[in-house]
Amino acid sequence: CNCLIDRKGRLHEEFVRVSPTFIQEDLMYSLDRVGVDYFDLYLIHRDDPHVPVEALMDKMEELRIAGYFKAFGVSSWQPSRVAEAIAYCKRMNYRGPSVSSPSYSLVHAQYNRWPGTWYADDEFAQWHKDNNIALFAWAAQGAGFFADPPLPAYDPEKAPMLTKESFLTEENFERRRRAMELAKVHDCSATNIALAYVLSQDLPLAAQIGPQNSWELEDCIKAMEEIKLTPAELDYLRIKRDTYED
């Protein structure tokens, strides 16, 4: 197992820091705080559509050549901006972004749950494979949506309106029910089924998870090493068929 140092640019909720100047400033701050000379991978966290993508890519190529990171990517960028960045880098013969990091999970988000974030649907996920760019799926387990018992955050009576509109849909509750059903078949948790669903996609994909202790980490590893979902089970979770049996 190799150690990968992945550092995103700092996120400030009170103002946007996506510009060539701020990117360099935050990169230097992060290197100093972590105590390393370079990062294996550096991601621009969030986006500001008002800043020309050309200026951002020029700066990232400059910093890459200077040796501050080996590769870079973007996090929660909408598809058109990622495509624009790749196209510009090809024209300029830059290395370009190697990674795009939207959220991608068994949950089908109707809307972006938080401002400035982006949730990938199956079409955008497939786009990564077609364009040879890795998909780093954050909240790959559905942000706790498949926990049993359900988390208070997903109580229809108490959840914030944006969560209700984005996550608490009839489709997602059916996906949750089916994940719990398959969990009994595979002798695991529904959260593991949700993670196995993401890992089973035929995509250049890495799943970002958030275990809070060693037991949860070991449980997540089980989804990677032991749970092999069949094509019928994957379609069942997508609600494309009525049974998971072939």
Summary of predicted features, one role per range:
Residues 16-34, 83-87:
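Short, acidic/polar
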Residues 31-52:
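Active-site groove signature of glycoside hydrolases
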